[in-house]
Amino acid sequence: VRLTRAFYIATREVTNTQYRAFQPNHTSGAEKYQQLAAGSHPAVMLSWQDAAAYCNWLSDQEKRPRAYAAIGGQLVLATPLTSGYRLPTEAEWAWAARYNGGGGSRRYPWGDAMPPPAGAGNYADRTAQGVVANVLADYSDGYTVTAPVGSFSPSPLGLFDLGGNVAEWVNDRYTVYPAGGALAVDPTGPADGQYHVIRGSGWRHSGISELRLSYRDFGDSGRLDVGFRIARTTDDKER
């Protein structure tokens, strides 16, 4: 993959307080009596469509062109791309998450080796025993479910929670990419498909494969461990 298009990406996941400015009655729910609805915690129990609708609403607040168009009752990425708020593409998310400076990349959010060091992020840890089935037995982050966004150390680019806290919706529809495929330039995902890609790990994850920054999941409805962050393409005045 090659990225040639400049973009902004939020340093933090969208919080309950921020999402409720758009949908005041939204609740992020609870897991085994553990509440996920605190204002500073990431907004969850949102479908991909809910996340895209928030992006359009935020664009409206700043009088930017909407990034998503309504077609057949569903929001889809507008073409050509606008400078409105949207979800990061999968390629943008992956580049931002794996960036390690000096041309290198990371295997895990904290570096290249297991286990995570103290304070690495909010994962399924000893604190979450009894709430999730599998935990990192020798790790404790102090949070049973979600944590306030930005509670742990940022990435080299200054981005928080690209691993841990909640997994995140990205723009692209889900597909299985063949190994050794042609170079993709600024990809935005397949044009069709029921499911969208989810990237990153969260408070329910403890497995080696789940904690890797290459981990991909997919879905179309809200989950207690999936939120989102916003991005947008730069406009001509910002380049």
Annotated model-derived regions:
Residues A6, A113, W203, T233-D236:
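Short loop segments at secondary-structure junctions
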Residues V1-A30, G39, V44-S59, G164, ...:
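A short glycine-rich, aromatic-capped structural motif
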Residues R64-P65, T234-R239:
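Short, charged low-complexity linker/loop segments at the C-terminal edge of domains
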Residues R2, E31-Q34, Q74-V76:
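Short, flexible, solvent-exposed loop/turn segments with mixed acidic/basic and small polar residues
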